[in-house]
Amino acid sequence: QIVGFDVDLAQALCKEIDATCTFSNQAFDSLIPSLKFRRVEAVMAGMDITPEREKQVLFTTPYYDNSALFVGQQGKYTSVDQLKGKKVGVQNGTTHQKFIMDKHPEITTVPYDSYQNAKLDLQNGRIDGVFGDTAVVTEWLKDNPKLAAVGDKVTDKDYFGTGLGIAV
């Protein structure tokens, strides 16, 4: 069963418009192609509204302001500079991956099909950090005192756009 903020919001929208909606779990980098080839009717998956994506699909008005955050083991790293030469997990095909590759090429990005898998590898010491949506990783911090934010929130609109929207 798929759970989370986006699913809860999508279910509320479906109820509001009296529609029967089905949900599927897909790799993030397959979402826009699935929409373009009409395998799905809408995508609601924490997707940043960026100029690059707006060239491919339409978006609703943003439903959530977005930022990103690095997370690592508690007490190990306090600044992003300390992650130079380290392995940081990202969800494959996301703006987080592009941001690190462009702005922090000295950090080794490790792509994952889901943030949950990146989180597991972080907790088990296979990677040094994860870079993801602030809303997602903040929940991890609440649930796991062994994890901590590394540096400040990142709000670069060139990468994280004008917020999260529903792609249609």
Q: Could you say what each language-model-derived stretch is?
A:
Residues 13, 35-36, 83, 122-123, ...:
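Hydrophobic residues within well-ordered alpha-helices
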Residues 18-20, 36-45, 87, 105, ...:
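Alpha-to-beta junction loops
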Residues 7-8, 22-33, 75, 110-124:
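Short helix-initiation/N-cap motifs at beta->coil->alpha
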Residues 60, 72-88:
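Flexible hinge/capping segments at coil-to-helix
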Residues 64-71, 134, 141-168:
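Periplasmic-binding protein-like
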Residues 1, 10-19, 96-114, 141-145:
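Ligand-binding cleft/hinge of the Venus flytrap
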Residues 1-46:
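Extracytoplasmic small-molecule ligand-binding "clamshell" domains
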Residues 1-8, 81, 155-158, 168:
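Short, solvent-exposed loop/beta-turn-alpha elements that line the ligand-binding surface or hinge
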